[in-house]
């Protein structure tokens, strides 16, 4: 499976704090931002760089910069917004695209109710952010939308993933790498990840 579990001590520590049943909205939201920042560092390891000249204090020197069009970060509404600040802390020049999905009552498949993409999507790397990868339906649908816009360099950043969701993404889009803080046990009968985090969107926005 094309999944990268980020096994860093700080990531594991912060994720455990988020799993606590009495984790407050403020604490959960703060930890979401902190985890997103740490994980974005790992997900950006293979960014291509190029050399260029700058004027240093002692004259011209050669330095490095990220090559090509600026990354677009793609939060899936609404829970994905909770990870956005953490990624932007690390990559403040990133462009933001947004995808909103809802379940079709007849087919039970996710359909888009809102999408806003930046220009030149076919030239940009994209990083999809969503706290939970459960069934994988929303992630697959978002990747479908990005590829329709010509985007080919796509990664997914999630806090917790279920094996079912990882398999769904890998089956539909084997070229997309998933970065996660934990690959949990399974989904329960209601589609929640076990042990998971509960409803991450409700916890981030204080609507639980």
From Swiss-Prot:
Family annotation (InterPro entries): PRibTrfase_dom, PRTase-like, Upp_B, UPRTase/APRTase, Ura_phspho_trans
Binding positions (uracil): 193, 198-200
Task: Choose any GO biological process term that the UniProt entry carries and state it.
Answer: uracil salvage
Q: Which GO terms describe its molecular function?
A: GTP binding; magnesium ion binding; uracil phosphoribosyltransferase activity
Pathway, per record:
Pyrimidine metabolism; UMP biosynthesis via salvage pathway; UMP from uracil: step 1/1
* Keyword set, alphabetical order: Allosteric enzyme, Glycosyltransferase, GTP-binding, Magnesium, Nucleotide-binding, Transferase
Q: Pfam family example for this protein?
A: UPRTase
Disulphide connectivity of cysteines? none
As its record notes, the protein acts as a catalyst of: UMP + diphosphate = 5-phospho-alpha-D-ribose 1-diphosphate + uracil
Q: How is its activity regulated?
A: Allosterically activated by GTP.
> From what superkingdom does this record's organism come?
Bacteria
Q: Which cofactor does it need?
A: Mg(2+)
Member of which family? Belongs to the UPRTase family.
The entry's function note states: Catalyzes the conversion of uracil and 5-phospho-alpha-D-ribose 1-diphosphate (PRPP) to UMP and diphosphate.
Q: What is the recorded name of this protein?
A: Uracil phosphoribosyltransferase
Originating species: Neisseria gonorrhoeae (strain ATCC 700825 / FA 1090)
| The gene coding this protein | upp
